[in-house]
Regions:
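Short, glycine/charged-rich "phosphate-handling" switch motifs in NTP-dependent
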Residues: 6, 18-19, 27
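Catalytic metal- and UDP-sugar-binding loop of GT-A-like glycosyltransferases, i.e.
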Residues: 9-10, 69
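A short, surface-exposed alpha-helical micro-motif characterized by mixed small hydrophobic
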Residues: 1-2
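ATPase nucleotide-binding modules
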Residues: 22, 26-88, 101-119, 142-148
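Generic C-terminus detector
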Residues: 119-148
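Short, conserved beta-turn/loop elements at beta-strand boundaries and strand-helix junctions
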Residues: 90-97, 139
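Residue-level marker of beta-strand positions
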Residues: 6, 64-66, 124
Length: 148
């Protein structure tokens, strides 16, 4: 993202989106662009694999579609209302940690934590989704609502 002022994202020879790296990161036009830009890539899960409370937050145009959240918009919480998940992988990267988790419904979620994490594979955790940072996609993968 730091190599250019403007980026063209192509898929099968067709232009998907043109814009600054941050425009593509913050306002992708579809799920393909959303997952193409950023490392680790955006978490995208079918709404059907997420708890009812998350499904209820989706705009009507995203029903049956998917939710996208960047790893920095997912947090591990002690709140009982958090989404249950199990740690499947921990990547200690020095100044930050990537925690890969799976919900009982089957959604795979990556959490970017700014500090070192003390989690281990198999640990039960609770996840908090910052839905103010949500990207909603329809059943065709088109963006129906991006972060404000």
């Amino acid at each position: 993202m730091t190599l250019a002022d403007r980026v063209v994202v192509l898929r099968d020879g067709l232009i998907e989106q043109v814009g600054s790296p941050l425009d593509l990161y913050d306002r992708p036009v579809n799920q393909f662009v959303a997952q193409f830009i950023g490392t680790p890539q955006m978490n995208v899960a079918l709404l059907s694999t997420l708890p009812a409370v998350v499904q209820a937050a989706a705009p009507a145009s995203a029903k049956g579609g998917s939710l996208g959240l960047r790893p920095e918009s997912v947090h591990i919480t002690t709140d009982a209302d958090g989404i249950a998940a199990k740690v499947v992988l921990v990547e200690a990267l020095g100044a930050e940690t990537l925690i890969y988790a799976q919900t009982p419904e089957g959604a795979q979620v990556v959490v970017r934590q700014a500090q070192r994490a003390l989690f281990r594979v198999g640990d039960a955790v609770r996840l908090q989704f910052d839905l103010s940072q949500a990207h909603w996609f329809d059943t065709e993968g088109r963006t129906v609502q991006n972060v404000a």
